[in-house]
């Protein structure tokens, strides 16, 4: 008598991916708190914050022999409880409709990200408010950017002024050469200034992370819409939302998520423009807006500049069928240049309008802050550090100190030029938005690897770009169909 075969349950790929990133996210969060914040100070400030909400005895029990704080522990417990529900839904996926399974999973992931990223960031914002301006925040992305907004409103050039008499100085002076430089571009403080004015007028204080959190939430939604299937939408939400490094950057307030938003917005608009063009509708306005968004990214941080060659190559390649008539290449190039300029000019104009006035105001100071400081040629340069080629320079003793100059530009050129050529060649053969992002990410990674510093926040940013690239390039699937995904995201 034959026995009925019962299939063995195997977790879906998205469940396994969520579990891996959830564990990584929690471990990194707790280690980051332990490394960056003195535990007694953390417990004291949390007790002050919750003095009227939780009994002191409960706080003491949660704080006993812990390297993190009671609120973070509760957020972690909620997140793992939600993951248990996720596993049950995944277990029952054959008994539930595809639409119901996707919607429940999507909502659970959103809630988990909300707990571990937005909830944790909200906690640090509140702790900073009851503690000190230099506490629970990144020095450059939060503290220094807030000071530049104050300089802006006072008519002071942030590229000329120093930051010795600001909360930045409380971080210490050894290797803190950013006290004499603002290494970011003007859009970082120009965009945030209205939020500063509204926040200080309404509640009396401001935290730059409010801007980052708002833009990160929009980034997650836009990134989901860049993909072509519900499975890809769920995957990009998991990896982007629980990015082991980028999520910590959002929590502490580094500004890579700010740059990421403008890039994702630009590509979302460009994708809409291409869809409109395929439907024989005029895509001009959407296309121009997409270039404006990328221009804003370029006016925020130099890491976005490496995207421009691939955007130019993509625009030229997609125009080529319109100008190719079997003639020689020189004629094709000359025929295509006016159209290329017409497509790219909003990006260039946006960058010039945002950065130009500051450059004209004091060009030497701006170049020194944005370029010479990171290149090691400023009077007070950035240190040699990170996870890239620079460690070999230190290991071989090629510099007397970590602040000394070494010609990393040679290594950068040796790595970046072939990567740029290969990326443009591949883009020419395989034109597509995912190919543009892929070439950008590989070129930026190669350049940063050979640079003076490959900081961990750059890797989180690169992981975000690679994540979007991967899921954008995934083939279309109708399990569940695109309408279900759109309904869940609505």
What are these regions (language model features)?
Residues 262, 269, 286-288, 293:
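Amphipathic coiled-coil alpha-helices
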Residues 288, 292-316, 353, 452-458:
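Transmembrane helices and adjacent periplasmic/lumenal helix-loop junctions
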Residues 367-370, 476-486:
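Short, Lys/Arg-enriched, Gly/Pro-containing loop segments at transmembrane-helix junctions
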Residues 111-112, 485-489:
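Nucleotide-activated chemistry modules centered on ATP-dependent adenylation/adenylyltransferase
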Residues 2-109, 113-279, 313-456, 469-470:
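Primarily membrane-embedded glycan-assembly and transfer machineries that use lipid-linked glycans
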Residues 459-477:
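Transmembrane alpha-helices of multi-pass inner-membrane enzymes
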Residues 284, 326-327, 483:
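Residue-identity detector for glycine
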């Amino acid at each position: 008598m034959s026995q009925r075969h019962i299939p063995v349950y195997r977790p879906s790929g998205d469940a396994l991916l969520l579990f891996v990133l959830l564990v990584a996210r929690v471990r990194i969060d707790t280690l980051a708190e332990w490394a960056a914040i003195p535990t007694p100070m953390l417990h004291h400030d949390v007790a002050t914050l919750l003095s009227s909400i939780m009994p002191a005895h409960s706080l003491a029990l949660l704080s006993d022999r812990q390297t993190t704080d009671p609120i973070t522990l509760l957020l972690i417990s909620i997140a793992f409880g939600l993951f248990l529900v996720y596993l049950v839904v995944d277990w029952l996926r054959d008994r539930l409709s595809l639409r119901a399974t996707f919607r429940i999973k999507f909502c659970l992931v959103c809630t988990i990200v909300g707990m571990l990223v937005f909830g944790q960031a909200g906690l640090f914002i509140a702790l900073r408010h009851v503690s000190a301006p230099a506490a629970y925040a990144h020095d450059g992305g939060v503290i220094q950017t807030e000071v530049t907004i104050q300089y802006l409103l006072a008519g002071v050039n942030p590229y000329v002024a120093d930051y010795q008499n600001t909360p930045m100085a409380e971080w210490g002076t050894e290797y803190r050469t950013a006290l004499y430089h603002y290494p970011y571009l003007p859009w970082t403080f120009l965009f945030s200034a209205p939020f500063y004015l509204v926040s200080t007028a309404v509640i009396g204080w401001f935290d730059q992370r409010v801007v980052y959190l708002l833009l990160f939430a929009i980034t997650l939604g836009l990134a989901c819409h860049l993909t072509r299937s519900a499975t890809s939408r769920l995957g990009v939400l998991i990896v982007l939302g629980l990015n082991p490094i980028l999520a910590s950057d959002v929590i502490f307030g580094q500004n890579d998520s700010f740059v990421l938003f403008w890039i994702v917005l630009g590509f979302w608009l460009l994708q809409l423009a291409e869809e409109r063009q395929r439907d024989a509708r005029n895509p001009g306005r959407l296309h121009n807006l997409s270039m404006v968004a990328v221009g804003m990214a370029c006016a925020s941080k130099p890491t976005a500049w490496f995207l421009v060659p691939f955007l130019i190559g993509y625009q030229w390649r997609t125009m080529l069928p319109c100008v190719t008539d079997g003639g020689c290449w020189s004629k094709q190039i000359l025929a295509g240049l006016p159209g290329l300029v017409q497509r790219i000019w909003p990006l260039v104009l946006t960058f010039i309008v945002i950065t130009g006035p500051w450059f004209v105001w004091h060009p030497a100071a701006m170049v020194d802050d944005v370029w010479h400081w990171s290149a090691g040629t400023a009077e007070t340069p950035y240190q040699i550090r990170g996870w890239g080629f620079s460690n070999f320079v230190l290991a071989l003793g090629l510099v007397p100190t970590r602040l000394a100059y070494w010609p990393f530009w040679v290594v950068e050129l040796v790595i970046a030029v072939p990567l740029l050529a290969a990326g443009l060649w591949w883009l020419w053969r395989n034109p597509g938005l995912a190919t543009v992002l892929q070439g950008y990410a590989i070129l930026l990674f190669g350049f940063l690897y050979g640079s003076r510093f490959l900081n961990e926040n750059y890797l989180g940013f690169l992981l975000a770009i690679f994540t979007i690239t991967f899921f954008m390039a995934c083939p279309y699937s109708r399990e569940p169909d695109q309408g279900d995904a759109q309904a869940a995201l609505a």
